[in-house]
Amino acid sequence: SFLFIYGLETRLAYSDAESMLTLYIEDVRDDINDASDENLLALTRAIREEVEDLGSLNRAALVELLKKYDVSEISIIDENGIIVESTTLIYYGFDMASGEQSKEFLVLLDGTNELVQRYQTVSHKAGVAMKYAAVTLSQGGFVQVGYNSQRFQRDIDERVEGLTRNRHVGEDGFMLIANNNFNLVSDPNDHEGESLYATTGLKTEVGGEWQLTREVVYGEDSLVMYGVTEGYYIIGVMPMREVVFGRDM
C-alpha cells in the first residue's frame, strides 16, 4: 500500500541521514583528537629534552619547567613504574600499575617510546579530568606531562576554532562544535564564542551520543546528532527538506 511504501521510504531516508551524520561526526572527532594529541606530545617532547639536559632532577627544576611550558603537571617515572619526582607532591611514590588510567603508560617501560591519552578522569584523583602524554627518557623510565581542562581547552580551542565552518553534510547540512561551556567554537554562520543554545535555537540539551533527534536549528526543521570528544560537542545538522527530498528521489 501507499502508506506502507511511504513509511518504508521515510525509515530509509532517516537511516541514510543517520549514517551520513555519524560519518561526518566521526571525521571531525578524529581531527580534534589528532590536533589534541599532537599538541600535548609536542609539549612533552620539549620538556623531555630539557629534563635530559638537566641531568639531576629535583622538584624545583620541574616547577620551573611547569611554569615555562604552562602545563598542569610534570612527573618523572622510574624503570619500575613508580613516580620518583613530580610537581604534584601527593604523587610521590605512586605506583603507575595501581590505576586503570595510569597503568596504560607502563608500555613505555616495554619498548614503546611515547604515548598520549584521551582527556579523561585520572586514577589518583577521582573526579578530576586531565589529559596526559609521556615520552621515554634515555636513562630509563619516562617523563609524563598533563594539563587540566582549562589549560587543555585554551590550547585546543585555537586549533578547533572554525574547523567545521566549510564542511557540508549533504547539500545544505552543516557541522557545529561547542566547548564544555556550550559556547560555539566552530559555526558556519560565524557565531564563534556565542551560546550554542541561544544562538542556534537548539532546545534539547546535549545528551546521548549518536541519537538522532528532530530540532529547529537556525530556524529550519532539521535532523540533529551529537558526538563528544576531548571535552567538545560535535553537532551534525541536516535539514528535513533534504532528508525528504532524498526519500522522493
What label would you give each PLM region?
Residues 74, 175, 213-214:
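Generic short beta-strand
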Residues 12-21, 35-36, 152-164, 240-247:
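Juxtamembrane amphipathic/coiled-coil helical coupling segments that flank
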Residues 132-152, 223-248:
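Short, hydrophobic beta-strand elements of compact beta-sandwich sensory domains
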Residues 18-59, 79-91, 140-141, 147-157, ...:
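Extracellular/periplasmic ligand-binding regions of membrane signal-transduction receptors
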Residues 82-89, 131-133, 182-190, 225-226:
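Amphipathic coiled-coil signal-relay and dimerization helices
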Residues 59-61, 88-122, 155-163, 188-218:
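Extracytoplasmic/periplasmic sensor domains and loops in membrane signaling proteins
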